[in-house]
Amino acid sequence: MLRSTSTVTLLSGGSAKSPGTPSRRANVCRLRLTVPPENPVPQQKEKKIERKDQPPELSNGESTKKLPQGVVYGVVRRSDPNQQKEMVVYGWSTNQLKEEMNYIKDVRATLEKVRKRMYGDYDEMRQKIRQLTQDLSVSHAQQDYLDSHIQAQASALDSFNAMNSALALDSVGLQKTLVDVTLENSNIKDQIRHLQQTYEASMDKLREKQRQLEAAQMENQLLKMRVESSQEANAEVMREMTRKLYSQYEEKLQEAQRKHSAEKEVLLEETNSFLKAIEEANKKMEAAELSLEEKDQRIGELDRLIERMEKERHQLQLQLLEHETEMSGEMADFDKNRYQQLEEASASLRERIRHLDDMVHCQQKKVKQMVEEIESLKKKVQQKQLLILQLLEKISFLEGENNELQSRLDYLTETQPKTEVETREIGVGCDLLPSTTGRTREIAVPSRSYTPYTRVLELTSKKTLT
C-alpha cells in the first residue's frame, strides 16, 4: 500500500469581497497528494476526470464541508524536482465545458461549410479538411465521452485550446486562399472583359472591311461594264500595244541570247584552263609517284646493304674476340711471333669495324634524308590531290552555272508570247550553240594503280619495321 498525505483547499469568491455583497459558493477544489519517492511512478501525466457530488473526507482532522454541486474535477499527477510525486485536482463548472463544446461545434460547422465551398478546387485543401474532419470526429467522440460520463481531465482543456488555435490558423489560411481565389477570379473576369472588347472591336473592323469590299466589288462591276463597252473601240490600240510589247520582248530575248553565248564562252575557257591544270597536276603526281617508287627501291637497297654491313661487323667482332681471348692466355717465348700476328690482326679488325661503323652511320643518314624527301613528296602529292579536288569542284560549279543559264534561255524561249496579229505574222528563230557539257564530262582523270593514301600507309609501315 502507498502512504500518502492529502490536503484539501477550498476557495470561495466571497472572502475577498465586501461584506455587503452576497456570498458565492466556491467553484475550485484542490487536492494535493504527496507520494513518497521509494515507489517509482512513470513520468507521464495521467489525467482523471471525476464528478464528485459529496465532499471528500479529510484525513487531517479538519471539519467536513459541503462542496458545490455541478463541478467537474480533474486530477493531474506530476513530479517535482525533489523526486516527490504530487497529484493536483482542478475543478471546472459544467457551463464552461458546455461553452467550450458549443464553440467546438460552431468551429466544426464553419469548417464543414468552408470544406463544401472549397471542395474540388484544391487537392491539398481537401486533404487538410479531411484531416481536420478526422480531428473533429475524434474531438466529437471525446465530447460524447465527456457528456456520457460527465468527467473532464485536466489536460483536456489545454488540448482543446491548442486544437482551437490550430483550427483558427487553418481557418485563417482558408480565408487567405479564398481571398487569393477571388482575386484570381476577378483578374480572369477582367481579362474576359478585355477579350470581349477586343472581339467587338475586331468584329466592327471586319464589318467595315466587308462594306468596303462590297463597294469595291460594285466598282469592279462598273469598270468591267465600261471595259466591255470600250473593248471594240480600243481593239486597234491593243493590237498596236501588243506589237510594241512583242518587239521589245524580241529585243530582250536576243540580248539574253548574246549574254548567254558570251558567258558560255567564258565558262568554256575557264573549264578548259581548269582541265589543263588538272592534267598538269596529274602528270606531276605521276612523276612524284615514280620518284617515290624509286626512293622506295633505293631505301630497300640501302637497307639490304646496311644488313650486310651489320653481319660483316658481327663476324669481325667475333674474330676480334677470338684473337683477344687467345692473346689473353699464357704464351711462351716461341709464341711471340704469333702474339704479334694476333695484335696486327686485331688492330686491322678494329680498323675494319670502325670503317664499317662509319659506313653504316653514313648509310643511315642517307636513309633518313631519303625518308624526309619521301615525306615531303607525300605532302606535295596530298597538296596536288587537294588542288585537283578543288578544280573538279570548280568545274562542277561552272557546269551547274552553264546548265542554269541554258535552262533560263529555254524558259525564255518557251514563255515567248504567241499572239496572233491580224495584220501580219511574225516568227523568230535562233540557232543555239551546241552544249559542250558532254565533252567536258568525257575528260577523265588519269587512272592510277594505287591511291596515294595506301602508298603512304605502306611507307609508314616499312619505316616502323626498319
Swiss-Prot record:
Biased composition (Basic and acidic residues): 44-55
Function text: Plays a role in cellular signaling via Rho-related GTP-binding proteins and activation of transcription factor SRF. Targets TJP1 to cell junctions. In cortical neurons, may play a role in glutaminergic signal transduction through interaction with the NMDA receptor subunit GRIN1.
Taxonomy, superkingdom: Eukaryota
Major place of residence: cytoplasm
Assembly mode: Interacts with DSP, MPRIP and TJP1/ZO1. Interaction with MPRIP inhibits the activation of transcription factor SRF. Interacts with GRIN1. Interacts with DYNLL1.
Gene name of this polypeptide: Myzap
Protein name (record): Myocardial zonula adherens protein
GO cellular component: anchoring junction; cortical actin cytoskeleton; cytoplasmic side of plasma membrane; I band; membrane; RNA polymerase II, core complex; Z disc
